[in-house]
Design a protein with these regions (language model features):
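Loop-to-transmembrane alpha-helix initiation sites
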Residues: 18, 66-74, 93-97, 135, ...
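Helix-loop-helix "hairpin" substructures at the membrane interface of multi-pass membrane proteins
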Residues: 25, 136-208
């Protein structure tokens, strides 16, 4: 089975594209996911991943690359959510729920207008084995930009993630870094859509990060471990999907979930918690 997968990598260009794309998305998704779970923004990640659907649908209708429409609508959704929840009367989860459900409904209607149920299935659940050269290179370039941004602004992102009040008192522009993270999240959601689809993007973002959180004692270690786990889950999931002829995107997510489940019971932090409970 492994030899067949290796032979496929050597002989099939589409599988080479899929492997490279899966690795890149696993790495960048794991890195960004650390900031998402530390800020308690998992629901925001889910919202943006669904909100890109209208942009993808419009891109199909206009015959342009789906990255363009998806990024525009992802940024629009994140801006709307941030603006609505700035009202003290409206809670954060309410703003997110209203926005992402509205964008999702609009996207489904637009896909219906385009008369493309096959494309809708691929958008919702991903089709990494169909990644073209152009899509792969866009994914690589966008991911490099995201990783470079995290590296350059690591310290202020760290401060605003752990203690935004302290960061503000130190003169850090908290709102700027919030919007910066929203842009980063949107870019990653759009690139990950090819791998697992809009439905499962949030799992690819938060599961490796949550697993790394069980082991790491610093943000740098957490990011490195999360990226490694994301890459590992992506490769194993692709191998399982290709070998058994099942959805590779879903296989990637389930592999990542299995790694989390194992870590949940054996990680040092969990062992310490169990000892504390016994005492």
């Amino acid at each position: 089975m492994i030899s067949e997968f290796i032979d496929g990598l050597l002989n099939f260009h589409f599988l080479q594209n899929a492997l490279i794309t899966a690795l890149v998305i696993g790495i960048v998704g794991g890195a960004v996911g650390c900031f998402i779970i530390l800020r308690g923004m998992s629901l925001m990640g889910d919202a943006i991943s669904h909100a890109v659907l209208p942009g993808v649908a419009i891109s199909f209708i206009l015959g342009i690359n789906f990255f363009i429409g998806a990024i525009i609508f992802g940024l629009l959704a994140s801006t709307m959510i941030t603006y609505i929840k700035s009202n003290p009367i409206i809670k954060s989860d309410t703003a997110i729920g209203i926005t992402f459900s509205s964008f999702l409904a609009l996207g489904i209607i637009l896909i219906g207008v385009a008369n493309s149920s096959t494309d809708l299935f691929h958008i919702l659940f991903g089709n990494i084995l169909a990644v073209q050269d152009m899509d792969m290179w866009i994914t690589i370039i966008v991911s490099l930009i995201v990783l470079a941004t995290i590296t350059i602004f690591f310290r202020p992102l760290l401060l605003t993630s752990f203690d935004p009040i302290l960061a503000k008192s130190m003169g850090v522009k908290v709102s700027f870094y919030h919007y910066l993270l929203m842009v980063i999240l949107t870019l990653v959601a759009v690139t990950a859509m090819q791998s697992v689809g809009t439905i499962l993007i949030v799992a690819l973002l938060i599961t490796p990060a949550a697993t790394a959180y069980l082991y790491a004692h610093s943000l740098k270690t957490m990011i490195l471990l999360s990226s490694g786990l994301g890459a590992l889950a992506s490769v194993l999931g692709l191998f399982i999907g290709y070998s058994f002829n099942i959805a590779a995107g879903s296989s990637i997510v389930l592999t990542s979930a299995l790694l989390f489940l194992i870590s949940f019971f054996i990680a040092p932090k969990q062992s310490g918690m169990k000892k504390t409970c016994k005492q």
